[in-house]
Amino acid sequence: MNAKPGFTDYIVKDISLADFGRKELSLAETEMPGLMATREEFGPKQPLKGARIAGSLHMTIQTGVLIETLAALGADIRWVSCNIYSTQDHAAAAIAAAGIPVFAVKGETLTEYWDYTAKLFDWHGGGHPNMILDDGGDATMYVHLGLRAENGDTAFLDKPGSEEEEVFFALLKKQLKEKPKGYFAEIAKSIKGVSEETTTGVHRLYDMQKAGTLLWPAINVNDSVTKSKFDNLYGCRESLVDGIRRGTDVMMSGKVAMVAGFGDVGKGSAASLRQAGCRVMVSEVDPICALQAAMEGYEVVTMEDAAPRADIFVTATGNKDIITIEHMRAMKDRAIVCNIGHFDNEIQIAGLRNLKWTNIKPQVDEIEFPDKHRIIMLSEGRLVNLGNAMGHPSFVMSASFTNQTLAQIELFANNKDGKYKKEVYVLPKTLDEKVARLHLAKIGVKLTELRKDQADYIGVKQEGPYKSDHYRY
């Protein structure tokens, strides 16, 4: 299986992997009932006809099923991965072979990553996208910061705060020189909205809303219950240990593990390690989450306490500088360090660059300190479950991606009479319950049905929604 004759609008590692990718896409479809039901329900209506979706989300097999669902609903698509290590090359090849522009290679350089992101916005056939589907907010930030610089505020371009920002800001400077005047303004004007997949990207959206700089309506997919309480929790519960094992072949049972953060991702990560037989410690800044961790039986400590004690370290906070150089200096010889938050700045990777690095295998590095003690770093501090393993299972991603599809329909087809303003929204609970309902039969769940008198007694409709918006699941 090769690309369609004459179709060259893609960059993948090896297009000959497309057959392998297509077989795995077929397998994944069986495990993604929400997306398949969405195709069946909305396919004939073509609600995304005319949508030009710029997608920046891990180019995995599961994402391939999402892409083909969006296409089945009428959308035209361009796609990149939102992480330099998360692409599954056979998945990217299968999507390219189907004639969909995709620019994604496992192990991209940062320069390639941002060059590929820029390719999202120069549409095949001319023009620009009119929708963004984002994970982490990089595609959204590309337009917002590009427009800011185009409008004359360029001082920030000379003040990068990380290696990644150096590369990103260099690209923006290049674009300002090479693209026609008003390039970013045209893109910003053409886009109708963005749906955001993950916690980090959602924080960026709320920050822009607070500052009054958000350019379009946005739907926070992450805080749909059927995303955050399933993908973030149960997905991490399965994929974290998978990544650590594939990377290191270490015996988990009996090891001491430290998880920084006890939000949904941290909860899933701690459970993953406990189920593997680890003795798990947790650090937290939030007293509520700290109390939850303690009540679950975890030892709640600081990173300073854990550094000399733990064998395995996992960051899951969405914050920066959680594991510092000083922490790593205090760790045991060959302690394993990894991150399952979106960005690599949870671990002070930049401060390790002047030390001796020995690559063991792809996405596994041994770093030696001057005192000769070493640590094992997985995926250079980027997402361990996608860099060292295959990410979350298809079933749980079906729920997340069904939410993404519904969010794209809402913003593109249902934004009538100014329904959505330049603010951040969440999908209504009726859709959240619908997404859950679509996944029940696959795992043999039988719902109890409320009688009318029972529904009246608790003040809900028989068909739902069954909980108030402020209910905490």
Swiss-Prot record:
UniProt cross-references to InterPro entries, sorted A to Z: Adenosylhomocyst_ase-like_sf (IPR042172), Adenosylhomocysteinase-like (IPR000043), Ado_hCys_hydrolase_NAD-bd (IPR015878), NAD(P)-bd_dom_sf (IPR036291), S-Ado-L-homoCys_hydrolase_CS (IPR020082)
One GO molecular-function entry: adenosylhomocysteinase activity
Listed pathway(s): Amino-acid biosynthesis; L-homocysteine biosynthesis; L-homocysteine from S-adenosyl-L-homocysteine: step 1/1
SUPFAM superfamilies in the cross-refs: Formate/glycerate dehydrogenase catalytic domain-like, NAD(P)-binding Rossmann-fold domains
Binding site for NAD(+): 198-200, 232, 261-266, 284, 319, 340-342, 385
This protein's UniProt keywords: Cytoplasm, Hydrolase, NAD, One-carbon metabolism
EC class name: hydrolase
Gene3D superfamilies assigned to the protein according to its UniProt record, in alphabetical order: Adenosylhomocysteinase-like, NAD(P)-binding Rossmann-like Domain
Entry annotated with the keyword Oxidoreductase: no
Pfam families: AdoHcyase, AdoHcyase_NAD
Amino-acid positions noted as binding substrate in the UniProt annotation, renumbered to this chain: T60, D135, E197, K227, D231
Domain of life: Bacteria
Co-factor note (free text): Binds 1 NAD(+) per subunit.
Compartment(s): Cytoplasm
Keyword NAD: yes
Cofactor: NAD(+)
Family: Belongs to the adenosylhomocysteinase family.
Name assigned to this protein: Adenosylhomocysteinase
Protein source organism: Bradyrhizobium diazoefficiens (strain JCM 10833 / BCRC 13528 / IAM 13628 / NBRC 14792 / USDA 110)
